Amino acid sequence: MSAEMSSSTRTIYVELLDEGTTVARPTQGEALAGDVYRLLPTPEYDPDDEHWEFPPGSVVRVVKEIRDGEEVLVARELVTTNR
């Protein structure tokens, strides 16, 4: 990953659907503007295995949340899909 790419990406948590409990998958998000990011797939992403609330390529608005004592960014609102 280039230095340019790494400076514009952050870890974003995306809720997984159909898991039977609340689960969030960490992935990378490309910063677009303020609290808006484009979600990138994880290397092992399989849409038949995991159902992300917002699939890779989606442009989402994130919010800061405290999880396990740490502040993280969580995808909460779809801005647009870009598949």
For the regions a protein language model found, what residue spans apply to each?
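Extended boundary segments
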Residues: 2-23
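Short, Lys/Arg- and Gly-enriched loop/turn segments at beta-strand edges
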Residues: 23, 65-79
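Loop/turn positions that initiate beta-strands
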Residues: 57-60
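Short, surface-exposed secondary-structure edge patches
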Residues: 49-53
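Short, structured beta-strand/loop micro-motifs enriched in basic residues and often containing a Trp
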Residues: 36-46
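Short beta-strand-centered aromatic/proline hotspots
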Residues: 25-30
